[in-house]
């Protein structure tokens, strides 16, 4: 068995070589963290979708004070380089991630994707998942989807807490966060700034989606605990504001939508065994709402109530999870993996 400890403390010539694909908000954050961990990893390539960034130094694209000597390029050019891992930060969906992932594994590289659906990809894309698994095994590499949510807070962390139970009867977990730092696209997909009627129309038309990843998390939990659910029920309701709220991208008056309360329930014999909630809104403090991550597990002889206040930061958390899983993905058996197949996550320092 390969020593995980050895991978965690690797130095010098044993540094993991990494290519980052996608230089948006998350990809740029991952690139910065990789550069900060130069004693553990070496960034050998960076890929941007926009061709006007190609040929530029990564340090300039990231607006760093120094150049890195790494030229931003196309995916094909980056994959021609020797690397241990490619981190993909370009999309939320398996169908959009699939083609590039096949190119990555075809070049003999392990892949970490932060696409939310990739955390448990067979739920929405069973055929593509089978293709990815076959390609990874053929090329003796591993594919993993991860992030802070899905990937950690509302699935991996929940399951870790069940380890102290004789028997689990029910799980209720919620993540309450502030949307204010996010941009226009997130405001649109969460329905912020709409009227109640506009919100409901957006739900019907699919322009207001709420949280991407709930189906992955609830199925991951159920599979890990051996629960065969009868049905999974999702609801998305508008969070109406009683006060005026404002961000650089949207203004919300009283009676308008300040966010989306997205809930998913895993049902067995008419009972909700798993309930996951993700109410997201701008400036929740204006109505006295505390942000945080909350997990309640009921067992046959004990219960656990865990609260993290404020919530684990979504951006920083996802960036960290992508980087922290590098040594585990490098050491993992070939194939398409999930967080259920990995050692418990920890800081890669």
What would you call each of these model-derived segments?
Residues 116-140:
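Rossmann-fold NAD(P)-binding glycine/threonine-rich loop
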Residues 2-62:
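N-terminal Rossmann-like dinucleotide-binding module
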Residues 50-81:
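Conserved N-terminal Rossmann-fold NAD(P) cofactor-binding segment
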Residues 282-349:
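C-terminal helical cap and adjacent loop that interface with cofactors, partners, or active-site loops
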Residues 91, 109, 115-119, 148-149, ...:
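Short, ordered loop/turn segments at secondary-structure junctions
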Residues 79-85, 94-116:
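Rossmann-fold NAD(P) dinucleotide-binding segment
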Residues 90-91, 277:
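Short glycine-/small-residue-rich Rossmann-like dinucleotide-binding loops
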Residues 21, 162-287, 291-293, 307, ...:
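Active-site-lining helix/loop region of Rossmann-like oxidoreductase modules
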């Amino acid at each position: 068995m390969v020593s995980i400890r050895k991978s965690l403390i690797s130095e010098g010539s044993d540094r993991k070589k990494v290519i980052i694909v996608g230089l948006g908000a998350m990809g740029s954050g991952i690139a910065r963290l990789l550069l900060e961990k130069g004693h553990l990893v070496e960034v050998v390539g960076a890929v941007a979708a926009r061709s006007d960034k190609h040929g530029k130094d990564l340090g300039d694209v990231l607006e760093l004070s120094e150049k890195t000597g790494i030229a931003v390029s196309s995916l094909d050019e980056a994959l021609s380089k020797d690397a241990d891992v490619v981190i993909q930060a370009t999309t939320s969906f398996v169908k959009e991630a699939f083609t590039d992932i096949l190119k990555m594994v075809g070049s003999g590289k392990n892949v970490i994707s932060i696409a939310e659906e990739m955390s448990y990809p067979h739920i929405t894309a069973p055929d593509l998942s089978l293709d990815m698994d076959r390609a990874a095994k053929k090329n003796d590499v591993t594919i993993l989807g991860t992030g802070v949510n899905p990937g950690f807070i509302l699935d991996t962390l929940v399951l870790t807490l069940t380890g102290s139970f004789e028997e689990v009867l029910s799980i209720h977990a919620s993540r309450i966060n502030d949307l204010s730092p996010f941009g226009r696209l997130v405001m649109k997909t969460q329905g912020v700034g709409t009227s109640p009627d506009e919100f409901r129309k957006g739900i019907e038309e699919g322009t207001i989606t709420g949280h991407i990843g709930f189906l992955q998390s609830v199925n991951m939990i159920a599979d890990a605990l051996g629960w065969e659910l009868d049905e999974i029920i999702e609801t998305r309701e508008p969070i109406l504001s009683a006060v005026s709220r404002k961000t650089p991208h949207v203004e919300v008056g009283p009676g308008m939508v300040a966010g989306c309360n997205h809930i998913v329930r895993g049902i067995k014999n008419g009972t909700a065994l798993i309930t996951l909630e993700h109410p997201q809104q701008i400036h929740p403090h204006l109505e006295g709402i505390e942000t945080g991550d909350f997990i309640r597990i009921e067992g046959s002889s004990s219960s656990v109530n865990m609260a993290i206040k404020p919530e684990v930061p979504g951006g920083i958390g996802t960036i960290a999870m992508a980087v922290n899983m590098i040594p585990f993905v490098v050491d993992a058996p070939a194939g398409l993996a999930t967080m259920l197949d990995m050692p418990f996550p920890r800081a890669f320092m």
